[in-house]
């Protein structure tokens, strides 16, 4: 009887442990965070585009924090053909951050929000991006899109600049093998004397 009881206990432990193993913290193979100041609003459009690692079971339940003073604009997943589809999500408010939680049916996901603290009343404009990684990330890029008619864009830490296919200038910070709970910060400053939004000047891609 003691032997049978021991076997039953062992079986129960294995069964109850399995879900916990399945829910272990996932790894992201790639995450790109795009910061687009004055794109289609006098704010900073913040876009997260990520991909979970191949060994992460799908659907993958993910949770990301954004500052509590902002609200999610959209959450989506990307299908194998590259098309985006809206995704249901929940939010949990904290003292300083709001957690966005969703279940991604495919490896690729995207969510967006606006940083509405950008002051565009003076030519000297600046904003700060600060975020803490919830998961390990194999390849992380933070990309700033320079607004149309802006000049003297400076980032801290320094970034590499390049011209995109849309003719705009982009500044990129790249990191690899980022651990969970690491702090990611980027200060951005630039000069812009008008209120023209970038979206009103960028031509849509050719069909």
State what each model feature region is.
Residues 6-16:
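Bacterial N-terminal signal peptides
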Residues 19-207:
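Lumenal/extracellular ectodomains and adaptor appendage modules
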């Amino acid at each position: 009887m003691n032997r049978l009881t021991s076997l039953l206990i062992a079986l129960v432990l294995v069964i109850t442990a399995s879900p916990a193993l399945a829910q272990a913290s996932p790894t992201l193979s790639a995450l790109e965070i795009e910061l687009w100041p004055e794109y289609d609003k006098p704010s900073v459009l913040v876009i997260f585009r990520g991909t979970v690692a191949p060994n992460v079971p799908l659907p993958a339940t993910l949770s990301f924090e954004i500052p509590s003073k902002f609200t999610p604009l959209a959450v989506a997943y990307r299908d194998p053909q590259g098309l985006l589809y809206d995704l249901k999500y929940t939010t949990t408010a904290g003292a300083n951050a709001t957690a966005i939680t969703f279940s991604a049916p495919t490896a690729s996901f995207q969510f967006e929000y606006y940083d509405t603290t950008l002051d565009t009343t003076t030519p000297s404009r600046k904003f700060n991006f600060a975020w803490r990684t919830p998961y390990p990330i194999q390849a992380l890029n933070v990309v700033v899109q320079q607004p149309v008619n802006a000049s003297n864009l400076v980032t801290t830490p320094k970034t590499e600049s390049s011209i995109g296919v849309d003719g705009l200038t982009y500044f990129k910070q790249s990191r690899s093998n980022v651990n969970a709970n690491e702090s990611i910060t980027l200060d951005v400053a630039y000069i812009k004397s008008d209120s023209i939004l970038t979206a009103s000047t960028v031509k849509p891609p050719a069909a």
